[in-house]
Amino acid sequence: MPIPILHCDRNSKELYSRFLQGAREDLTTATDRILPILESVRTQGDQALFSYTEMFDGIKLSQLTIDPKKIKTNVDEKTKEAFLRAKSNIEAFHMEQKRESWSKVIDGNRLGVKYTPIPSLAVYAPGGKALYPSSVLMGIIPAKIAGVPSIQLITPPQKDGIPEILVWLAQIMDIDRIVTVGGAQGIAAAAYGTESVPKSEFIVGPGNAYVAAAKSYLSGQGLIGIESPAGPSEVCIIADENANPKWIACDMLSQAEHGEDSSAILLTTDLTLAKRVSEELEIAFSERPKRLQMKQTAIYENSSILVFPTLDDCIWFSNELAPEHLEIQTKDYESVFAKIEHAGSVFLGPYSPVAMGDYISGTNHILPTARGSRIYSSLGVDTFLKRVTFQEVTKESLENLYPFVKLMSELEGLDEEHGTSVKVRTRQFQ
């Protein structure tokens, strides 16, 4: 059952029905299941967290938080070297995003912006097979650069304790505490706060449908901020006849490895390349059978190769799709990139697979999905900063601008108090 190869143009109805409806996860069922959990944590606090941890994780905890500085770790040196290299690159990239407060005189008044960090952050790290220590770096580093003063790591407990790599990362990133609670109850603890778990104003990090549902619901209630709403992982690849079909197949499968709901879409004008990529996918399935059923489901059911008449058509569709990850594997990839408007993160040229950004290059891998990059950006320093605008109006400027305030406030029917609050400061009133 090879991957579907579809011949398309801008008027193809299937493009809209199949690809442009948005692939955001339907969290209705998950939300229904987690609402009682959220309410229990809100009303019962620590007691609910102990109970749910024993129920879902099979672990009876004696405490809910630990100080990472008090735990000895034995992470091997090669692993440390890899994560320290990633940490260095991520820090260097995100340092370029730092903001400076500013002010400027406009029409006689000093106006400006003061940047202040959010007061607190929780970073969620899933447990078990879905352990993503790289996401811990991606969430914490830009927050640290932004100046967030309080950061806690939330992760489900394991039968043999918290994974050493997470503890070590918490140590080198100077995290306040590790909260040993996972799932929706862990998200609720961060949003509401309990006797042992301080409330956080913002939370980031990957998780299953129940974690996503809890984040979405609690954010909608105004209880905690989140990064862009999450959906299944996705990659879009724009490629021409110069691209390597084996490399493209590998890049598509690297997304399929995330889960059967992941998607990988190749956009090309070259039918020969399309067929060769399809063949390379089948070869890869036979050569690398690990997680075979999951990868095949993602490729056969959620992925496609789309053949368009022109490269501009491929670019147009990519902008409509607004993918989480976009690879551009064309001869003149810079000219293609110049026309890209919507993508979470872009990978330019044949030697820039998504996995480089996932781990080591330095860009952030916490990205908007399901066409979210049309309105959201990747996680960054700005995510954790607030803009406080200010103005200092001079006496002379107030005198000069009062007639305009008077006219505008009268027009809106608010002159009695709005207009008066300016008028009483003018010479004619005094």
Swiss-Prot record:
SUPFAM superfamilies: ALDH-like (SSF53720). Keywords: Amino-acid biosynthesis, Histidine biosynthesis, Metal-binding, NAD, Oxidoreductase, Zinc. Substrate binds at S233, Q255, H258, H325, D358, E412, H418. NAD(+) binds at Y124, Q185, N208. Its EC number is 1.1.1.23. Pathway: Amino-acid biosynthesis; L-histidine biosynthesis; L-histidine from 5-phospho-alpha-D-ribose 1-diphosphate: step 9/9. One of its GO terms (cellular component) is cytosol. This is Histidinol dehydrogenase. The gene is hisD.
